[in-house]
């Protein structure tokens, strides 16, 4: 029996990156052997064993044979005669198919180290195309390692495109698509994930609402980048910058809202382009459709839909009437969910800066709207009750006093 460290831990170690999770492969053993050594089996379909001391995951070396459509349609062989090389060849990319022996030797039968040095994401064998999930995984790795100069090999991109066109992607469950996508949203360059999926044709299959933005023009005066898909990717990049070092914000939710904020532009009638009157309200339906299909968590969906509807309100914050401001606050339920509103404001800032040449533009609207929020929050609910108001009258009076507080702040707010 031999044990090897495999996959991402070996890859990241060679890249000089911190190793988060360590996965191990056991060669020359079976279930009974590991159980007799005190390992605890978890998972029925695919047996993984927990080391009794470290609690790290160990798996028996295996081979896979395609048996039906989708990413689960495989027959596995866990025989003790399976070699390390046989186990490694079933993996997706060469850089993920390296192993390290217990004495520290790197085993690299498929050229992963060379591809690591050359910054190439390359598939190992034609069996790559047997698993449609790999299209998303490779796009996610491209997003993760883009800042290090990694590119997808042309032949791998061609295979991903074949897979996207084959109909295999339709067999992926919503949960798996969202899991990969949420992971991608947390990478350094999530825009690369969506751009890669667009290049391969997978975006139109899995994220048709986002893909529909491609080629939809905006007025060049306000959007020098013109194209709505390009703008959305620039907004996503800005959202990354704004959330990367802010532990308070739900960064993947902010980034998802950034992607959805202009989905309504794909529905703009041709005869009024490049203008997009009413795209805010129009964006709610495609956002809801996307979220329902991919079973996106409700928090993400709510933030994305509200962002679609109200992002231009913040752009025009200085023009809003006090009544409109309070309606906005009520729609976001800022009284009970203050963080969500701050996340929304970050998307609005990302939207402003996600335009070619506007990357460092000042956005005083956030300070202004937060001042109005502060004044509205100063209104004391208990005082309203103490003043004798009851039931619905409490809510009505509270709204009146909040509007008055906002009006006073608007009047006294310094303008340059």
Curated annotation (Swiss-Prot):
Instruction: Enumerate the residues binding ATP.
Output: 8, 11, 91, 137, 140
**What are the recorded GO MF terms, alphabetically?**
ATP binding; CCA tRNA nucleotidyltransferase activity; cyclic-nucleotide phosphodiesterase activity; magnesium ion binding; phosphatase activity; tRNA binding
Q: Where is the signal peptide?
A: none
Q: Superkingdom of this entry's organism? A: Bacteria
Disulphide bridges: none
Q: Which CDD domains match?
A: HDc, NT_ClassII-CCAase
Q: What binding details are noted for the cofactor?
A: Magnesium is required for nucleotidyltransferase activity.
Annotated EC: 2.7.7.72, 3.1.3.-, 3.1.4.-
Names of required cofactors: Mg(2+); Ni(2+)
Span of domain HD = 228-335
Q: Which PROSITE patterns match?
A: HD
Q: Which residues bind Mg(2+)?
A: 21, 23
Q: Which GO terms describe its biological process?
A: RNA repair; tRNA 3'-terminal CCA addition
Q: Which UniProt keywords apply?
A: ATP-binding, Hydrolase, Magnesium, Metal-binding, Multifunctional enzyme, Nickel, Nucleotide-binding, Nucleotidyltransferase, RNA repair, RNA-binding, Transferase, tRNA processing
Q: Give binding positions for CTP.
A: 8, 11, 91, 137, 140
An example of a Pfam family matching this protein is: PolyA_pol_RNAbd
Instruction: Name the catalysed reactions.
Output: a tRNA precursor + 2 CTP + ATP = a tRNA with a 3' CCA end + 3 diphosphate; a tRNA with a 3' CCA end + 2 CTP + ATP = a tRNA with a 3' CCACCA end + 3 diphosphate
Q: What else is known?
A: A single active site specifically recognizes both ATP and CTP and is responsible for their addition.
Q: Which family does it belong to?
A: Belongs to the tRNA nucleotidyltransferase/poly(A) polymerase family. Bacterial CCA-adding enzyme type 1 subfamily.
Q: What does this protein do?
A: Catalyzes the addition and repair of the essential 3'-terminal CCA sequence in tRNAs without using a nucleic acid template. Adds these three nucleotides in the order of C, C, and A to the tRNA nucleotide-73, using CTP and ATP as substrates and producing inorganic pyrophosphate. tRNA 3'-terminal CCA addition is required both for tRNA processing and repair. Also involved in tRNA surveillance by mediating tandem CCA addition to generate a CCACCA at the 3' terminus of unstable tRNAs. While stable tRNAs receive only 3'-terminal CCA, unstable tRNAs are marked with CCACCA and rapidly degraded.
Share what the entry says about its subunit structure, partners included. Answer: Monomer. Can also form homodimers and oligomers.
Q: What is known of its domains?
A: Comprises two domains: an N-terminal domain containing the nucleotidyltransferase activity and a C-terminal HD domain associated with both phosphodiesterase and phosphatase activities.
- Which NCBIfam families does the record match to this protein? PRK10885.1
Q: Specify the protein name.
A: Multifunctional CCA protein
Query: Which organism does this sequence originate in?
Result: Haemophilus influenzae (strain PittEE)
Q: Which gene encodes it?
A: cca
